[in-house]
């Protein structure tokens, strides 16, 4: 079945059909397409545009088609042009001429626009639920190792002592912002484009507010050209997906390092690790590595759709068929990563003794040593210089600030006293900072 066959004297070449078809991508929206058609048909009947009898046939037929697809009794035709064509054709074959009235006052342009918004509205709920699950796993891990002291880095150089819970807390804050981005995008997306027609609305006395309300939208898009040509919501969601995946990638990078023999800060559960086909000793953090790699894929989806949209004149263009490949892949990838990583993190074991031992080196309490002098009245820049000289002395003598005798401290600055050892104790350092 072709919805546009009347004007043409030749059948489309098979290569044209194959290239033009989007059924492999948009078939997942069959539920949303049926929901949109039910709302549209009900409105048409309410406005007297189609008869109540035809509307009843349409609604019953659409309900049967939905049930048959879900049960597997009806298979979606892989040769159909798109899901809209397939469902309308199937409906007409079942109920006759009444099915031909369904598309009155509607274009596939506004039909697909409403379908994808309905589908993504549900998908966003799935993603936010998964993000909350990852936050819960991270929060549980932070509480489990709340007082575990570890190295804090800047420039990947040892910087200051921190707690594991503070470190993980940073990722929790990132994920909370991610939640906000998805929620904000979903709110802007929740306007109905149905009734926009091909681009210029329709001459039929339709009720756009009625269909918007029936489909759970907050209202409808006032400009019909924008209604069919807007894909900002896809770009916004892909932007949210990309930022989320950047955060996930950063977390995974650290987990990968922590699980290495060089760090030995953490160990993943066997159920969430893999091995090598040739090296018997290997225990690889493949889930974390795959998630890190998939960040590039999602960012690519965003860049691809941005590039597709950047040169399109108003209103609808067939280029926009690429939107679903990008947004579905981005959202699917995010859900896959969140689903895999949450139990991996929940079962991950930290090794506090190794983390504490590593924190003892690298003079990460030097700032606290300088702050001790400031507490004695020395200007910070002078305290900074004196502490730098102490660090140089320790490096020369192969010792640490904790091991350096008080006489050596006093040789650099007479304001030092025995209290400096309490000041540079790592546990005291993190406590004073409220970590």
Predicted regions and their residues:
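Glycine-rich cofactor/substrate-binding loops
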Residues: 1-36, 97-98, 279-435
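Generic, well-ordered alpha-helical scaffold segments in large soluble proteins
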Residues: 40, 61, 65-68, 90, ...
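Short, well-ordered beta-strand elements within core beta-sheets of diverse protein domains
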Residues: 40-50, 119, 166, 235-243, ...
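Charged, flexible cofactor/metal-binding loops and thiol motifs
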Residues: 121, 143, 151, 157-311, ...
């Amino acid at each position: 079945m072709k919805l546009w066959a009347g004007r043409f004297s030749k059948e489309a070449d098979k290569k044209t059909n194959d290239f033009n078809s989007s059924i492999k991508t948009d078939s997942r929206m069959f539920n949303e397409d049926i929901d949109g058609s039910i709302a549209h048909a009900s409105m048409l009947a309410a406005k007297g545009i189609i008869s109540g009898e035809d509307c009843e046939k349409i609604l019953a037929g659409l309900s049967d088609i939905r049930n048959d697809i879900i049960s597997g009794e009806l298979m979606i035709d892989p040769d159909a042009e798109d899901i809209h064509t397939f469902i309308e054709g199937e409906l007409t074959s079942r109920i006759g001429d009444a099915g031909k009235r369904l598309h009155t006052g509607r274009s596939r342009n506004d039909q697909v626009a409403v379908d994808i918004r309905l589908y993504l509205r549900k998908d966003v709920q799935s993603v936010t639920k998964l993000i909350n699950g990852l936050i819960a796993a991270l929060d549980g891990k932070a509480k489990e190792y709340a007082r575990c002291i570890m190295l804090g880095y800047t420039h990947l150089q040892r910087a200051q002592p921190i707690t594991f819970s503070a470190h993980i807390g940073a990722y929790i804050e990132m994920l909370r912002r991610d939640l906000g981005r998805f929620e904000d995008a979903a709110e802007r997306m929740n306007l109905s484009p149905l009734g926009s027609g091909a681009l210029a609305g329709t001459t039929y006395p339709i009720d756009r507010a009625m269909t918007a309300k029936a489909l759970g939208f907050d209202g409808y898009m006032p400009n019909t050209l924008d209604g069919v040509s807007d894909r900002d919501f896809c770009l916004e969601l892909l932007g949210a997906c990309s930022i989320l995946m950047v955060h996930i990638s950063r977390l995974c990078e650290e987990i990968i390092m922590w699980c290495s023999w060089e760090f030995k800060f953490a160990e993943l559960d066997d159920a969430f690790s893999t091995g090598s086909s040739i090296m018997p000793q290997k225990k690889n953090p493949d889930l974390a590595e795959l998630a890190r790699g998939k960040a590039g894929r999602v960012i690519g989806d965003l860049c691809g759709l941005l590039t597709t949209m950047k040169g399109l004149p108003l209103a609808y263009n067939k280029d926009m068929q690429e939107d679903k490949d990008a947004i579905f892949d981005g959202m699917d990838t995010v859900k896959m990563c969140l689903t895999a990583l949450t139990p991996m993190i929940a079962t991950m074991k930290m090794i506090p003794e190794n983390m504490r031992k590593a924190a003892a080196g690298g003079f990460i309490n030097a700032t606290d040593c300088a702050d001790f002098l400031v507490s004695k009245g020395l200007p910070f820049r002078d305290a900074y210089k004196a502490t730098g000289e102490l660090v140089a002395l320790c490096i020369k003598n192969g010792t640490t600030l904790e091991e350096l005798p008080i006489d050596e401290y006093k040789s650099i600055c007479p304001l030092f006293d025995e209290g400096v050892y309490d000041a540079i104790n790592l546990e005291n350092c993190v406590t004073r900072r409220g970590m």
